[in-house]
A protein has these predicted regions:
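Glycine/proline-rich, positively charged
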Residues: 2-95, 99, 174
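Structured C-terminal cap/extension of enzyme domains
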Residues: 79, 99-227
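Hydrophobic/aromatic residues located in beta-strands of well-ordered beta-sheets
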Residues: 1, 63-64, 111, 181
Length: 227
């Protein structure tokens, strides 16, 4: 981590950001304040954690959390300082299942999964031509798509829903350690549609969940979490 990156993560700046959020939201306290994707090195310095705990003691936030992946997320979970973990988890990004869920659950942390549908990678991988408009465009989206293609290439899965969104979100929600999942959208109608689809069809057969886990484990070639 270079000096400029470290200088972004100071106790003073953390306090400034929390106070600014309180002012903007016109509230006396926040329910949750999370550190987003700071490195393991910065966590180990302790300054940002001290800032969060001071804010919590002062009543400015009820809970404190860490949002991130891989070794930094492992450190955050094992530290015992955080109430929540927000981390990447999806069909083509499953390392949280083997590295994070169990220790986080043991510490009674809330687990918030980010990118649960992986930019639509599973839907696109099944039929790339027909679903071209769903093709992930960001760099990490391309990696999701590559992994999903490899997993889908092992053949059809018996009983899988025709709507591959339900496969993607159902896979994440099938893991009992998951507290909630964040599905990003810029369109309120898409959000409402997603809610209705989850209400009426997100439960997956255990055989489908197990097959998707098996495929990831079989193909995993150091497929680390994508931040």
């Amino acid at each position: 981590t270079d000096k400029s990156a470290i200088d972004m993560w100071t106790k003073e700046l953390i306090h400034q950001h929390i106070d600014r959020s309180l002012t903007r939201m016109k509230t006396d306290y926040l329910d949750l304040v999370q550190l987003h994707s700071c490195s393991k090195e910065i966590l180990e310095r302790g300054e940002v954690i001290e800032a969060l705990l001071e804010a919590q003691t002062a009543g400015k936030t009820r809970f404190v959390g860490y949002s991130g992946d891989n070794e930094a997320a492992v450190w955050a979970v094992n530290s015992g300082y955080f109430d929540t973990l927000q981390t990447s988890f999806s069909i083509p990004d499953q390392h949280a299942r083997t590295n994070l869920f169990e220790p986080a659950h043991a510490r009674k942390m809330g687990i918030i999964t980010k990118r649960p549908i992986a930019n639509g990678a599973w839907r696109s991988a099944i039929n790339p031509t027909a679903n071209l408009r769903y093709r992930p465009m960001r760099v990490y989206g391309d990696e999701y798509f590559r992994r999903a293609q490899l997993m889908a290439g092992l053949g059809p899965i018996s009983g899988e829903p025709e709507d591959r969104f339900l496969t993607a979100i159902g896979f994440v929600l099938a893991h009992s350690d998951v507290t909630t999942a964040i599905v990003g959208t810029q369109n309120p109608s898409h959000m409402q549609d997603n809610i209705e689809r989850v209400k009426h069809g997100s439960s997956l057969l255990s055989t489908i969940v197990e097959e998707l886990q098996r495929r990831f484990d079989r193909l995993d070639d150091d497929w680390g979490q994508l931040t």
